[in-house]
């Protein structure tokens, strides 16, 4: 019987995928369990244990500051982890060994719920560990595919994100109840157990992974080529201004020293960074649903169909909506739009996601205005905002994870994912600094209550308009092999 050509064979799902998705679900349970109770725990345990109304707003600002600072470190470290994985040790070793450090950080956290300094140390260890593996995990998903099954990659990234939010749903439903009934020690201890489970699941799949070896520090790497091009650009600018002379373009000169493939890779990175430059402000707003929105929920009527939820549980609606919307978007909305003749490109998805983020925060701002006026509005308005924000996350976050992998050269896969995650870090440090200013009566102290949310809406709206101008000028090129 003649062999069936590769292009006619049915694409097969890599056998390693279940282990990666199982590991991610358990690890995300651990991470989001900590985040679920952190804002209210910090206020009640450290910043306003006497429940003094006079210092409540300052206590909430300090809680928000520390919460966003934690996320800043958690998403800054992927840059380090990505470089170490790509250049030195490979993704598998980095994920495995840093996961063990992650579990140790969880142990420190559960034993230090009455000591802010030690508790903060545990948070730093967890942030370093979570960040160290973050870029490697999503890039490791892409490594499992080649040209024979690359059409399945988009769906697997959807299921990968599904696993993240499955862990998030379970943790944000269960951990607040455990925190209320049994105290913070157990509430922070259970995530440690799940982190140990995540490490075990990942180790069990060790013989099934496609392990892309590290490339080493090559002479033709991104930094060296970029610095060389920058030096030539200054030289050419000097000649142009003072001598009105320019024989060649910058990249033509760079091509005399470096290979076309290396230069193409560097240019690809800059194309991606032009898109990722707009993600920090998205995350500056998005991450507030796990801190500012949680504290806002303490001032809402939390009755839903006769049952009163805990403030920390309302954030569960975000991953629930995500789990529902991922297949709706992937298998329903996107194909339907394509049938109308409109191509659903990654850049268009991201733009639509930024717009939906603005809409969700407008609802939150109006809700806060009612609270500022002395009202106790229904939580259903916040749930609507969570629904819209979930749609925005599907369009921005999942798309950017895939975009970081498919649009970057082989030697930059983990590092490009890390640069995207760095945007989350930058967004959170900005929000943390705003809250630090509020807590210390600084410049942003005037932006409290509803004006706080309107401030962020205004900033994102400006970035959204700029994105529309930039995105339509960017070419796209896939590097999947």
Segments from the language model and where they lie:
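Short amphipathic helix-loop junctions that connect adjacent transmembrane helices
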Residues: 36-62, 291-311
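Hydrophobic core of transmembrane alpha-helices in multi-pass small-molecule transporters
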Residues: 116-133, 373-395
């Amino acid at each position: 019987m003649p062999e069936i050509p590769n292009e006619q064979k049915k694409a097969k799902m890599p056998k390693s995928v279940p282990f990666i998705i199982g590991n991610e679900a358990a690890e995300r349970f651990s991470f989001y369990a900590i985040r679920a109770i952190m804002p209210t725990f910090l206020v009640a345990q450290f910043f306003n244990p006497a429940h003094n109304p006079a210092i409540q707003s300052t206590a909430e600002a300090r809680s928000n500051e520390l919460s966003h600072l934690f996320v800043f470190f958690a998403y800054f470290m992927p840059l380090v982890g990505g470089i170490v994985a790509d250049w030195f040790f490979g993704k598998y070793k980095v994920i495995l060994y840093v996961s063990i450090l992650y579990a140790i950080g969880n142990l420190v956290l559960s034993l230090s719920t009455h000591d802010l300094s030690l508790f903060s140390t545990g948070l730093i260890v967890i942030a370093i560990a979570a960040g160290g593996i973050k870029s490697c995990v999503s890039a490791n998903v892409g490594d499992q595919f080649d040209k024979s099954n690359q059409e399945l990659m988009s769906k697997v990234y959807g299921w990968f994100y599904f696993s993240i939010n499955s862990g998030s749903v379970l943790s944000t439903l269960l951990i607040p109840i455990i925190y209320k009934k049994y105290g913070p020690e157990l509430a922070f201890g259970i995530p440690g157990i799940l982190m140990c489970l995540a490490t075990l699941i990942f180790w069990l799949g060790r013989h099934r992974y496609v392990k892309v070896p590290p490339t080493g520090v090559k002479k033709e790497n991104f930094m060296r080529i970029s610095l060389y091009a920058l030096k030539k650009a200054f030289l050419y600018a000097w000649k142009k201004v003072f001598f009105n002379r320019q024989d060649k373009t910058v990249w033509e000169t760079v091509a005399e020293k470096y290979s076309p493939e290396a230069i193409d890779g560097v240019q690809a990175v800059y194309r991606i960074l032009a898109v990722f430059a707009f993600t920090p402000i998205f995350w500056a707003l998005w991450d507030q649903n796990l801190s500012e929105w949680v504290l806002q929920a303490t001032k809402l009527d939390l009755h839903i169909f006769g049952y009163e939820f805990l403030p920390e549980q309302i954030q569960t609606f975000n991953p629930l909506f995500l789990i529902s919307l991922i297949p709706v978007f992937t298998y329903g909305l996107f194909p339907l739009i394509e049938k109308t003749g409109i191509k659903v490109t990654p850049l268009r998805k991201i733009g639509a996601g930024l717009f939906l983020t603005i809409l969700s925060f407008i609802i939150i701002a109006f809700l806060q205005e009612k609270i500022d006026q002395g009202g106790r509005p229904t939580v259903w308005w916040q749930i609507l905002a969570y629904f819209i924000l979930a749609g925005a996350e599907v369009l921005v976050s999942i798309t950017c994870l895939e975009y970081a992998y498919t649009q970057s050269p082989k030697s930059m896969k983990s590092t490009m994912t890390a640069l995207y995650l760095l945007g989350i870090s930058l967004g959170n440090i900005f929000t943390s600094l705003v809250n630090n200013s509020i807590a210390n009566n600084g410049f942003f102290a005037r932006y409290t209550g509803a004006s706080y949310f309107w401030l962020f809406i205004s900033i994102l709206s400006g970035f959204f308009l700029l994105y529309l101008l930039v995105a339509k000028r960017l070419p796209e090129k896939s590097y999947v092999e």
